[in-house]
């Protein structure tokens, strides 16, 4: 399996050769814990998410990706923001794709299922809000989660 390498404002980053609309979902349970995955491609922690398929709505992609990566079915309840910083490039070593960041981050509530790892998630855990900051994650993911935890009145647009 290839690796995922995130570059931020790095002069040595590869030039982007793709832009793929994607979703991430900050899913919470009844206790307010966040659903977190430890990714198989870079060993970092993240909220679930992935590419939006042709013919699929944003909420449908979010629900599908969450279920595929975690075993949890969620209901989408809100929007954290949009993240499209051209200085953030993600290199996938398996195929040479250098993707410019483009992600819509939603809020979801867990409605069914049990945390179950997949081929994209080494671990799936409910993490108390106060413990999320201690997890290793890339800068962009940390910012997305911090925006959610801050309870911003308006979605982030950037």
State what each model feature region is.
Residues 1-24, 96:
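Acidic, metal-coordinating catalytic segment for phosphate/diphosphate chemistry
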Residues 20, 40-42, 47, 74, ...:
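Short connector loops at helix/strand junctions that flank enzyme active sites
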Residues 27, 105-109, 126:
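Short, well-ordered beta-strand micro-motif
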Residues 29, 33-72:
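Conserved Nudix-box catalytic region and its N-terminal flanking loop in Nudix hydrolases
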Residues 43-44, 115-158:
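Nudix hydrolase/Nudix homology domain
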Residues 73-83:
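A short coil-to-beta-strand element that immediately follows conserved catalytic motifs
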Residues 85-114:
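Active-site-adjacent beta-strand/loop module that shapes the phosphate/pyrophosphate-binding cleft
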